[in-house]
From Swiss-Prot:
Family that this chain belongs to: Belongs to the [NiFe]/[NiFeSe] hydrogenase small subunit family.
Cofactor note: Binds 2 [4Fe-4S] clusters.
Binding site for [4Fe-4S] cluster 1: 64, 67, 162, 196
Record keywords: 3Fe-4S, 4Fe-4S, Cell membrane, Iron, Iron-sulfur, Membrane, Metal-binding, Oxidoreductase, Signal
Protein EC: 1.12.99.6
UniProt-listed SUPFAM superfamilies: HydA/Nqo6-like
Source organism (scientific name): Citrobacter freundii
Superkingdom, natural source: Bacteria
Name used for this protein in its record: Hydrogenase-1 small chain
UniProt GO MF annotations: 3 iron, 4 sulfur cluster binding; 4 iron, 4 sulfur cluster binding; electron transfer activity; ferredoxin hydrogenase activity; hydrogenase (acceptor) activity; metal ion binding
Binding, [3Fe-4S] cluster: 277, 296, 299
GO biological process terms on file: anaerobic respiration
Amino acid sequence: MNTNNEETFYQAMRRKGVSRRSFLKYCSLAATSLGLGAAMTPRIAWALENKPRIPVVWIHGLECTCCTESFIRSSHPLAKDVILSLISLDYDDTLMAAAGTQAEEVFEDILSRYHGRYILAVEGNPPLGEQGMFCISGGRPFIEKAKRAAAGASAIIAWGTCASWGCVQAARPNPTQATPIDKVITDKPIVKVPGCPPIPDVMSAIITYMVTFDRLPELDRLGRPLMFYGQRIHDKCYRRAHFDAGEFVESWDDDAARKGYCLYKMGCKGPTTYNACSTTRWNGGVSFPIQSGHGCLGCSENGFWDRGSFYSRVVDIPQMGTHSTADTVGLTALGVVASSVGVHAVASAVNQHNRHKQQLADAGQQSPDNEDKQA
């Protein structure tokens, strides 16, 4: 792969015949995908014109490669622009042409040549059981390779739920002792990008942000970028109105399902899952699981794999009940008023009865018979 890291992104794009207009359009799309607005387009353009491409080392532990499969389908920006122009992806044993001894020589060369300058991207996690022998890369335990690469990295990106939380290979009883990367690398800044897999446009946007601003994006307390993990899927879901109205799918392919009602009762984990699925969507913004008729699995949340069936809801959440009609609300209000009037009438009658008894008692004390008895 190209190791000319002094070339800027803009120079690489121009070398490929990309016009200035197309470059600025790319910067505008990048700003939009990052949620920065059009005002930040000039800053992104300046950064991509003047800053050398950042070398990236991408390594794989226990995983299924779904993060890479997702990343190469990025549309804003395109994965080819990220890989071939925005960054210098010098090592990735899935995408690179080299293999075996040649690949390991490239790995060692990058670590020494760009020590302290490269970004380490980790897909999958290291198993610690049996001295790490459950995952071997380059003839040695993956945990050794991860620590070796992390030592000279400026920052680490933990791609996917595997690297961020452990995922299915860490499911109970976790015989391989699969461990999230932040539990074994504790002296480097780590950006967690969970999801099984993460959204491709989120992956490329995070790289764009780090290249543009020379810093990590703002993170939440769990280490996730707030720009993409700051809200629940439920908060922006197009079926949210049905949730608020108490309109739910009760069984697959019932009339409510055909009407697009809320999937919460079918096990949707959207109310407890932080991700950008309902806003960014997948496949270039075409759709996401809930839009396709299936509830969210909560795959970007820690421990989702050990929380029971995907089709049972975790908790009961009270709804607003906005499905009530004006007549229903009116009858309810009338009932409340009638009840209040009834209670007031009963209370008044009781008070009046008590006053009447007191008056009779007072009158009895002042009667002639009582006066004669007293005399």
